[in-house]
């Protein structure tokens, strides 16, 4: 996997390559693997499995052969069954595998083309060093800055409506008191009283 991408850009985003293989009568299996020396994390996301134009009108079954793990009784898993007259191509969604991965043509003569996306993520341990450096800088800044006094709590301003209502009430009270002072006391029967029965 030779690349002209700089080391810093690899850390920013993963390297993504188009990948593909062919299974046929001569090559019934294919193993996708990466070198042991490569420290990057690799994933293979399958996209399509399709028949070639020379494929016979028969069923072609493609399966993934799980790795032999001690004490495991894993069997091959079929991922596509294709036939030129019925289904010449299958789109794969959500099949992301970690290498090594072995594909096998269980039945049929092919050719079958498997394609996908090979993503390589370089292990990035520089973040730990950067965080340590940032913490030291923050500690130095805290030591240099004296503690700032607490900020006073602001009271919310009274709303305009409340102020206007209060102003109107005060004006009304003033008018009533001025009317009482200006007008002489009324004489006669009391207002609002019921007349007494004779």
UniProtKB/Swiss-Prot annotation:
The keyword Phosphoprotein does not apply. InterPro entries: Nucleoplasmin, Nucleoplasmin_core_dom, Nucleoplasmin_core_dom_sf. Residues 129-147 are annotated as: Acidic tract A2. Signal peptide: none annotated. Residues 152-169, 186-198 have a biased composition (Basic residues). Keywords: Chaperone, Chromatin regulator, Developmental protein, Fertilization, Nucleus. Residues 126-198 are annotated as: Disordered. One of its GO terms (biological process) is positive regulation of DNA replication. A motif (Bipartite nuclear localization signal) lies at residues 154-169. Residues 127-147, 173-182 have a biased composition (Acidic residues). Residues 35-38 are annotated as: Acidic tract A1. The record marks 57, 83 as: Interaction between pentamers. It comes from the Eukaryota. It is found in: Nucleus. Mainly expressed in oocytes. One of its GO terms (cellular component) is nucleoplasm. Acts as a chaperone for histones, such as histone H2A-H2B, and thus regulates the assembly of nucleosome cores. Involved in chromatin remodeling, especially during fertilization and early embryonic development. May be involved in sperm chromatin decondensation during fertilization. Belongs to the nucleoplasmin family. This is Nucleoplasmin.
């Amino acid at each position: 996997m030779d690349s002209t991408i700089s080391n810093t850009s690899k850390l920013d985003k993963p390297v993504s390559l188009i990948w593909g293989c062919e299974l046929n009568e001569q090559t019934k299996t294919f193993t996708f693997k990466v070198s042991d020396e490569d420290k990057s994390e690799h994933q293979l996301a399958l996209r399509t499995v399709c028949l070639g134009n020379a494929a016979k009108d028969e069923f072609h079954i493609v399966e993934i052969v799980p790795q032999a793990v001690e004490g495991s009784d894993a069997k091959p898993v079929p991922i596509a069954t294709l036939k030129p007259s019925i289904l010449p191509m299958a789109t794969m969604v959500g099949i992301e595998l970690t290498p090594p991965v072995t594909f096998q043509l269980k039945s049929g003569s092919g050719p079958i083309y498997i394609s996908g996306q090979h993503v390589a993520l370089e292990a990035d341990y520089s973040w730990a060093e950067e965080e340590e450096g940032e913490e030291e800088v923050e500690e130095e800044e805290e030591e240099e800055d004296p503690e700032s006094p607490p900020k006073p709590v602001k009271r919310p301003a009274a709303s305009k409506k409340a102020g206007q209502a209060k102003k109107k009430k005060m004006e009304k009270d003033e008018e009533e008191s001025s009317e009482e002072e200006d007008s002489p006391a009324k004489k006669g029967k009391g207002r609002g009283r019921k007349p007494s029965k004779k």
